[in-house]
Amino acid sequence: MGEEQSTVSGSGGARASGGGSAGQPESPRPRGDRVRTAGPRAAASSSRPNGGGGGRDPGCVDASVQEPASNRAPAGQPARLPLSGPLDPQSLELQLEREAEGAGPREAPPGQQPPDGLLLDVLAQRHPPPAKPQVLCSVYCVESDLPEAPSAESPSPSESPPQAPLGPIPASPPPSFPSSPLSLPADPLSPDGGSIELEFYLAPEPFSVPGLLGAPPYSGLGGVGDPYAPLMVLMCRVCLEDKPIKPLPCCKKAVCEECLKIYLSSQVQLGQVEIKCPVTECFEFLEETTVVYNLTHEDSIKYKYFLELGRIDSSTKPCPQCKHFTTFKKKGHIPTPSRSESRYKIQCPTCQLIWCFKCHSPWHEGVNCKEYKKGDKLLRHWASEIEHGQRNAQKCPKCKIHIQRTEGCDHMTCSQCNTNFCYRCGERYRQLRFFGDHTSNLSIFGCKYRYLPERPHLRRLVRGSVCAGKLFIAPLILVLGLALGAIAVVIGLFVFPIYCLCKKQRKRSRTGMHW
């Protein structure tokens, strides 16, 4: 019924039957034809209607099409082989090779894949066609600075790519820009597959090995505070150990990170804002970024507090208790009462302490700042109160602000005016050579709490006597020294010529020369 059936003759030729064109031969079949032999599993398949044989492979026998009765063998007898001559299992390969040589090379029609090989069912054992291996492809995009050298082998005409038109070749974009889209077949196994556009973004390399070996040091923040500064194995100037060290930005000397952190922490504990370089030969100050980078969180807070305290003007002061900065406004935080000093009354928003902005002390109700500075009992009681084995606060002798000591010695430095004073007595640090300093017991500049603190009259008498003795002894020693010097000069004027003559006479007597 309009179907086309084809059978294979013993000589390998194809003939048309049942509705096909009688005078039109069928195209030769490729080498991949499936050949079936009789066996228990060989049976005729039911035919399915098809419009003129469309959609079938023209080079293969459709197993679903029913063969004519003339080509079917009787039941129980094997079917005829599509080979010329009898089938010998021992010489099967040789017969197949001869048949292939006789048929000659055949090409698959366009748009059709070539067959994989001959598939035979010998003795009712079907060998399935070999499965196509799965290919996993990894695409790598590598950009080279140098163009590729042309290949020595010239491609064949069928494989040669289309020639590009002559003209100037546009410059390739830098690696930081996305490369041109790359077209790849959708199915690598199919000759005419679709295309997939892939974009490869090549980020520029942050550094290169030759650049690291020959590049100069990074000119950033510098020092240990710079995370991008180069590391070099140097000997620390403090601990004298070889470590990976970033040189300091000020003097380019080597100080390890551990020693620098210990030094900076000690300076911050002393209240220093301008910290000098730990190298003794360098007289410059370290940068703020380097100091903050090498401090702990607590020391960093203290250092920033000292910085703010040194930068503020007279209209901003810290709270005496919690160090919260407060800026005074002329119209006051509290409505101005009858007395003018009440407008300096400040309540700290952090610790709720009420204090006086003018004298920087706790609020003194009913007493003006002048009386309070002269020795008010409230101020003395608050300042001289002992907490944790030390005074509550001490007043700077110059700027009159109160300073609390957390730890350390009695030598204090005011963060407001940089005045050196003693925390125990509140006096300035003075020293004079030959008369002593503030730490001397018998010096007139000594602390009153170091020598006879309970007997001030005797202390003054002893120190005054020592000072007077030094004043009287110093001129005597000076006069005595001048007298001895004059005597030595006079004696030298007479003795030196005589000594020279005697030495000259001895030299002549040794050489045998006479007058």
Swiss-Prot record:
It is found in: Membrane; Cytoplasm. This is E3 ubiquitin-protein ligase RNF217. GO terms for biological process: protein ubiquitination. Belongs to the RBR family. RNF217 subfamily. Changing residue 239 to A: Loss of SLC40A1 degradation. It comes from Mus musculus (Mouse). It catalyses: [E2 ubiquitin-conjugating enzyme]-S-ubiquitinyl-L-cysteine + [acceptor protein]-L-lysine = [E2 ubiquitin-conjugating enzyme]-L-cysteine + [acceptor protein]-N(6)-ubiquitinyl-L-lysine. Its EC number is 2.3.2.31. Zn(2+) 2 binds at residues 356, 359, 364, 369. A zinc finger (RING-type) spans 236-282, 396-425. The keyword rRNA-binding does not apply. The chain crosses the membrane at residues 476-496. The lineage of its organism: Eukaryota, Metazoa, Chordata, Craniata, Vertebrata. Zn(2+) 4 binds at residues 422, 425, 438, 447. Zn(2+) 3 binds at residues 396, 399, 414, 417. GO terms for molecular function: ubiquitin-protein transferase activity; zinc ion binding. It comes from the Eukaryota. Keywords: Cytoplasm, Membrane, Metal-binding, Repeat, Transferase, Transmembrane, Transmembrane helix, Ubl conjugation pathway, Zinc, Zinc-finger. Residues 1-125, 147-189 are annotated as: Disordered. Disruption phenotype: Macrophage-specific knockout mice have increased iron export and altered ferroportin/SLC40A1 degradation. The gene is Rnf217. Residues 10-22 have a biased composition (Gly residues).
